[in-house]
A protein has these predicted regions:
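Extreme N-terminal starter segment of soluble prokaryotic enzymes
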Residues: 2-4
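Structural motif
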Residues: 7-9, 30
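Conserved beta-hairpin
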Residues: 11-22
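Conserved beta-strand in the GNAT
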Residues: 20-28, 35
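Conserved acetyl-CoA binding element of GNAT-fold acetyltransferases
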Residues: 33-43
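Conserved acetyl-CoA pyrophosphate-binding loop and the N-cap/start of the following alpha-helix
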Residues: 45, 49-57
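C-terminal structural segments of small proteins and small subunits
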Residues: 61-93
Length: 93
């Protein structure tokens, strides 16, 4: 699969491959913390690694574009982060 491109909206990051939306992550900001509460990929993409790539692309977006600390409330996000501990620096203490 080609690279995922992230477009930021108000409290949502939407992921695209080319012009095709392949998922999104919803979050809410409270001060310097972003609570990541939902990720979604189309049913046809489930089980293909797209969800993992979505989470990683969104975590990179937070790292590169904000100073927020994250609180992953969606259970899929910590599952991905356990496999990619380099993103643990983003976690709220």
């Amino acid at each position: 699969m080609a690279d995922i491109r992230i477009e930021a909206e108000t409290e949502r990051l939407t992921a695209f491959v080319g012009d095709v939306r392949v998922g999104w992550m919803d979050f809410e900001v409270d001060g310097s913390t972003a609570r990541l509460y939902h990720t979604e990929v189309p049913a046809a993409q489930r089980g293909t690694g797209t969800g993992t790539r979505l989470v990683l692309a969104c975590l990179e977006w937070f790292r590169d574009n904000t100073d927020y600390r994250i609180v992953p409330l969606c259970p899929f996000i910590p599952a991905v982060m356990r496999r990619f501990p380099e993103y643990n620096e983003l976690l709220s203490r």
